[in-house]
């Protein structure tokens, strides 16, 4: 199977599908259609009925091969790649039997070094796909697409493996947070699903952050500095004051595990107007609400010293902890746990310090945990994929549909 995985991942990663947060269309970029149309053709060649809508959501069905009434399970992956780094002219490189030593990426000065990326130490002996140092790889999430496609191929070649109806979904714009925005849960028509969008071997994730964005706008009064006493209000300094009133220890670089944070993403402005953009994250719903409340309290504390209330706050929720919707349905987690145990894969159920499409889909009526893909260092030139771990991910998909049919 390794050769098929390498061939398919190479073909998919060399197609530029970078999304664009500034775009208002869905998909956000025309080039995502290139991969969507290819996948549609390949699924049809496998004999699967497909449904590609005007927003770039590609669904397909592998029909049940048993008479029993068993749940319909779905598998999802996203076609877009991150806008954080160059995604064009991707030139995948193969490392056979990785020796655990630093590896120079193409003709660049970039080096994939286990001292910097210690997770590489667990991949000694693996076949790796890496970049040439000039682009990201796009294994996030084309590895997930490959794993789903190869699992479907395997199931068709092995009709002795009994399974219920399987739904497949390839979606746009996950990297810019819009993946589920136009996802039609009713049209997808699965009882539950799994995103193949994790990272390290053994990840089985069903807890995510609660997430919000806060935009703080500070309005100043610009007066000639020579006569500014008791008249000037410097919006930049108001922004600095606002940020200083947030807990210094509750930032991404000083938190881990279940610890939440405030993250100042952008701060720009002039004396007259300054804007601060934060993301707010916490796994605990009560703490999440308290964090948003603290933002409003700081606004009020600063505004109390002025007559014209110069600080404005706009908070918008982005997604919520999917555990709230998944934990009441324990079979959705028990199924992959049994499969992991059967395959001798140690399950890592640590919470996601982020979100997936499943975070939103779970609240839209489709409970959707996340499973490892075997890739790492996403969104940059050090991205890699372990073909060996990808092979395990394919086995997990096959095991999930088999277990669902057996245990109903």
Curated annotation (Swiss-Prot):
Active site: 80, 174
GO cellular component: cytosol
Cofactor(s) needed: Zn(2+)
Record's cofactor remark: Binds 2 Zn(2+) ions per subunit.
One GO MF term: tripeptide aminopeptidase activity
Highest taxon of the lineage: Bacteria
InterPro entries the record matches: ArgE/DapE_CS, Bact_exopeptidase_dim_dom, Peptidase_M20, Peptidase_M20_dimer, Peptidase_M20B
Amino acids binding Zn(2+) 2: 140, 175, 379
Transmembrane region(s): none
Annotated keywords: Aminopeptidase, Cytoplasm, Hydrolase, Metal-binding, Metalloprotease, Protease, Zinc
Localization of this protein: Cytoplasm
Binding-site list for Zn(2+) 1: 78, 140, 197
Catalysed reactions listed for this entry: Release of the N-terminal residue from a tripeptide
UniProt EC number: 3.4.11.4
Gene Ontology terms: biological process: peptide catabolic process; proteolysis
Enzyme class: hydrolase
Function: Cleaves the N-terminal amino acid of tripeptides.
Listed PANTHER family: PEPTIDASE T
NCBIfam families linked: peptidase-T (TIGR01882), PRK05469.1 (NF003976), PRK13381.1 (NF009920)
Similarity remark: Belongs to the peptidase M20B family.
UniProt-recorded name of the protein: Peptidase T
């Amino acid at each position: 199977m390794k050769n098929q995985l390498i061939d398919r991942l190479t073909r998919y990663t060399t197609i530029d599908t970078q999304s664009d947060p500034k775009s208002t269309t869905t998909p956000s970029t025309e080039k995502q259609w290139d991969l969507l149309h290819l996948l549609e053709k390949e699924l049809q060649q496998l004999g699967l009925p497909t449904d590609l809508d005007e927003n770039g959501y590609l669904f397909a069905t592998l029909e049940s091969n048993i008479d029993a009434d068993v749940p319909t399970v779905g598998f999802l992956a996203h076609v877009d790649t991150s806008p954080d780094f160059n995604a064009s002219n991707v030139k995948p490189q193969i490392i056979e039997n990785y020796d655990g030593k630093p590896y120079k990426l193409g003709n660049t000065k970039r080096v994939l070094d286990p001292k910097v990326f210690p997770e590489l130490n667990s991949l000694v002996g693996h076949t790796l796909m890496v970049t040439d140092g000039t682009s990201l790889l796009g294994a996030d999430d084309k590895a997930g697409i490959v794993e789903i496609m190869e699992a479907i191929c395997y199931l068709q070649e092995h009709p002795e493996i009994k399974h219920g109806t399987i739904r497949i979904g390839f979606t746009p714009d996950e990297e810019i947070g819009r993946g589920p925005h136009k996802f039609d849960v009713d049209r997808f028509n699965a009882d539950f699903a799994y995103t193949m969008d994790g990272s390290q071997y053994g990840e089985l994730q069903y807890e995510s952050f609660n997430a919000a964005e806060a935009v703080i706008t500070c309005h100043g009064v610009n007066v000639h500095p020579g006569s500014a006493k008791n008249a000037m209000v410097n919006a930049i300094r108001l922004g600095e004051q606002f940020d200083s009133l947030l807990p210094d220890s509750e930032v991404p670089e000083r938190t881990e595990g279940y610890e939440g944070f405030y993250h100042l993403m952008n701060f720009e402005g002039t004396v007259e107007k300054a804007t601060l953009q934060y993301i707010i994250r916490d796994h605990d719903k009560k703490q999440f609400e308290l964090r948003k409340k603290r933002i409003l309290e700081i606004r009020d504390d600063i505004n109390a010293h002025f007559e014209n209330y110069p600080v404005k706050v706009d908070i918008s929720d982005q997604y919520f902890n999917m555990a709230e919707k998944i934990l009441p349905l324990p079979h959705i987690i028990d199924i992959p746990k049994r499969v992991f145990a059967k395959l001798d894969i140690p399950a890592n159920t640590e919470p996601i310090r982020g979100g997936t499409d499943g975070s939103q889909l779970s609240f839209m009526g489709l409970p959707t945990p996340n499973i490892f893909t075997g890739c790492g260092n996403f969104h940059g030139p050090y991205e890699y994929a372990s073909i060996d771990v990808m092979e395990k991910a394919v086995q997990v998909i096959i095991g999930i549909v088999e277990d669902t049919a057996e245990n109903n």
